[in-house]
Amino acid sequence: MNDDVVVSVLCTAYNHEKYIRSALDGFVNQKTNFRYEVLINDDASTDHTAAIIAEYEAKYPDIIKPVYQTENQYSKGVSITKSILFPQSKGKYTAICEGDDYWCDENKLQKQVDFLESHEEYAACVHNTRLLDCRTGGSWPMYKGEQDRDLTFKEVVNYSAACFHTSSILCRREWFCIPDELRANGFGDYPRAVYMRLNGKIHYLKDIMSVYRMFTAGSWTARNQNNASKQQRICSQKARTDFTEKLRRYCREQGVTPEYQKAVNDVANRDQLQLAVLQKGGRCLLHGPQLGIFMGLSLEKKIHVLDTVRTESKTERNEKR
């Protein structure tokens, strides 16, 4: 086996004592013909997360490489994966898995590396994920009936969030860190998905090889399980609209293909209209600049915007009751 590290796995953990063993077992049980490392940041957990990580560090010192924080870095606005873990990584490829999710296929890394090693034009390889509702215990695949295939740029940029889960990503090191012009928070790995697809193809494997725990304490799904207020919906849509405007400028400056620019323009215009609907109501589509933008959208995007109008009207009626 070559001594060079081929894959660096980046893992963030905070108060994950109920879940972290599953994540660590998924890491150390990988069967590969190459070396890999797991860089895991414990963000000053107040439970036993750090102690559990230390157990695995002692047992698998060549794999588990922890960083134990004495002060919580996330609360200080630090991007842990970009600023702490990635600079220490050595791998040709980068994988991600948060401490409350886990891998459920011991051949996951080998399958993805095998694909990328034989297809240099690809920026990343991703796969299907099982969603696990921690409130009910129910689970289901993120996608049903899919086949192995390439993800088009249009479908990647069309999604409101990434069209694959974070725990499924294996990408080439050079495409992991998003440039500052495209950095954004609040909607998962959508910016990273778009950036990777701008720089190469993304191959999707139908195999379910990871599990995403939903509604764990402190998770995004737990924080957003209740209906958001009108102001929260506006703030969320504004963040997305700001990002797609950044993306529009970035693509223009980078001189991407007309096909890609058209896809980005369509999405940015859709987001602009959805923000206008939230701020001014559906009637804003009937006149002024919004009408012109709406008429220029593809049929698919027009339907999307009209769905927003219907959903917002229904939500407002319910809030008044």
Please place each PLM-identified region on the residue numbering:
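Acidic donor-binding/catalytic loop of UDP-sugar-dependent glycosyltransferases
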Residues: 48, 101-115
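A conserved acidic beta->alpha catalytic loop
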Residues: 42-51, 71
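Cell-envelope/extracellular polymer assembly enzymes that use nucleotide-activated donors
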Residues: 5-8, 37, 191
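Short aromatic/hydrophobic "clamp" motif used to bind/position activated sugar donors
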Residues: 94
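Conserved nucleotide-sugar donor-binding catalytic segment
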Residues: 87, 127, 145-228
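Short, acidic, metal-binding catalytic loop of nucleotide-sugar glycosyltransferases
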Residues: 25-35
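Catalytic core of nucleotide-sugar-dependent glycosyltransferases
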Residues: 212-216, 222-255, 287-288
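Flexible acidic/His/Gly-enriched loops in nucleotide-sugar-dependent glycosyltransferase catalytic domains
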Residues: 61-64, 69-87, 110-176
